[in-house]
Design a protein with these regions (language model features):
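Solvent-exposed loop/turn segments flanking beta-strands in beta-repeat/beta-sandwich domains
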Residues: 61-83, 171-184
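Short, well-structured beta-strand segments within conserved domains
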Residues: 52, 56, 108-118, 168, ...
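Short coil/turn motif common to extracellular beta-sandwich-like domains
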Residues: 47-55, 65-72, 158-167
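Short beta-strand segments within Ig-like beta-sandwich modules, predominantly Fibronectin type-III
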Residues: 91-98, 188-196
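Surface-exposed interaction/gating patches
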Residues: 144-181, 191-194
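C-terminal motif of bacterial Sec signal peptides marking the signal peptidase cleavage site
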Residues: 13-16
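Short acidic/polar inter-strand loop motif in beta-rich domains
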Residues: 63, 93, 117-126, 191, ...
Length: 237
């Protein structure tokens, strides 16, 4: 009986240790910068099936190519290569590996962000690497401060659960220790981010993980801007 109780206590202790693993957030280093990469809108047309056809001009960036340091950073990677992240009203992005594609849009207003993404889904962060536009009633001021959520997204399995990319896109704003900041809440663990850069999460528990990103001012107050805050749930199996 004592042996059984000891075994149960051992199992409970191990389970408790596994569940209490510390969540950490670290800056991702070493990605190719693609300082001259550029995307611009070539055309947006509405076809007979009520689908919008988007065409983008992309230069100094190869869609479909594998980003050079994919293996080294150990992040979930798309086998189809580099692509465009296409976000509507700060919803989950769709990935596009060519510069021409079609999308169905809501009848209401659609704020659209398209930016260049490395094959492991890290955004290219330069002033020419994104397009921001809107289609519809045009109620949103595109000069507002924006934080768009990008990663993590969806379900992660196996080794991909060990290291998750945290990435977001800032437009018309900057963050710094003295100014605006991004507050990231991962389950119940909070981080204050003062540099716009890619980050990775480690120590996440299996199951559902809730991620909340908030653009806040120097006083830590939520900035009144479209799509702020951003909340997502991802699953680790």
């Amino acid at each position: 009986m004592k042996k059984i109780l000891a075994l149960i206590l051992f199992i409970v202790t191990i389970s408790s240790c596994n569940n209490s693993k510390k969540i950490t957030l670290s800056k991702l280093e070493g990605s190719p910068p693609y300082l001259n990469a550029k995307i611009s809108t070539a055309s947006i047309t509405l076809d007979d099936d009520n689908e919008y056809a988007f065409s983008f001009d992309v230069s100094d960036y190869e869609l479909g190519a594998k980003t050079i340091n994919t293996v080294e950073n150990q992040l979930a990677n798309s086998g189809k290569g580099q692509h465009i992240h296409f976000i509507i009203n700060n919803g989950p992005y769709s990935a596009h590996y060519t510069n021409n594609f079609k999308k169905k849009l809501n009848k209401d207003n659609n704020v659209i962000l398209a930016f260049l993404s490395r094959s492991y889904h890290e955004s290219v962060k330069n002033q020419n690497a994104f397009v921001l536009t809107q289609i519809g009633e045009e109620k949103v001021d595109l000069n507002s401060e924006f934080l768009f959520y990008s990663r993590p997204k969806g379900t992660y399995k196996g080794k991909d659960t060990e290291k998750l990319l945290l990435d977001f896109y800032l437009i018309n704003t900057t963050i710094s220790p003295e100014g605006n900041k991004v507050k990231a809440t991962i389950n119940d663990t909070e981080f204050i981010i003062t540099e716009w850069a890619p980050y990775y999460l480690q120590g996440l528990p299996k199951g559902n993980v809730k991620i909340k990103l908030e653009l806040v001012n120097s006083e830590g107050e939520l900035i009144d801007s479209p799509f702020n805050p951003s909340i997502r749930n991802v699953t680790l199996e």
